[in-house]
């Protein structure tokens, strides 16, 4: 596979994204890009690799306001490179930049990674490991392209939900967060630890997946058993009540 900036599928999706004007369609394309990156790429350094467990995607362009995007020029025209969130503060976080031009912002916030057999749940844990591999204090100063193709794409399911902690009214309900279950089974101990740390519920993934998959009642029941280990009747009823009111 080619590097990300020469990946024909990725480039075609970004081109499609830039030309679309419908907000729902734009967010659908963003989710396609996000899922492609999380299943086909990793962060590779001379002395180690971070596989992508959990990502959120952010975009701002002429066709999409994307108010929750930082809007830093380092999030533009640096496809495959890293963007460090810190500007003298203590909050740790970094993006993988996907923008190939100076007139739009496109990047993925790295929420979780896997290093060898260690699951790095906390955003800061992934930051520290990435910083150690990159050998720089500020990840924006790491010059090589860090995003590199996997030898083989992952084949496990990818789950989705809303991005975490957003308050902007136009951004907060968009389903633009992905979790790669090739590295983390839904019923595993590690999966439950993820939720214990982050303080949100597995039902958020379940609700988003019902919406994205447009499930019927039986499919909703089966999906609930798969993701939650039980039938989440309240969420299923709420989903179909809302669907009925929109018909």
What are these regions (language model features)?
Residues 1-247:
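A cross-family signal for N-terminal binding/gating loops and helix N-caps
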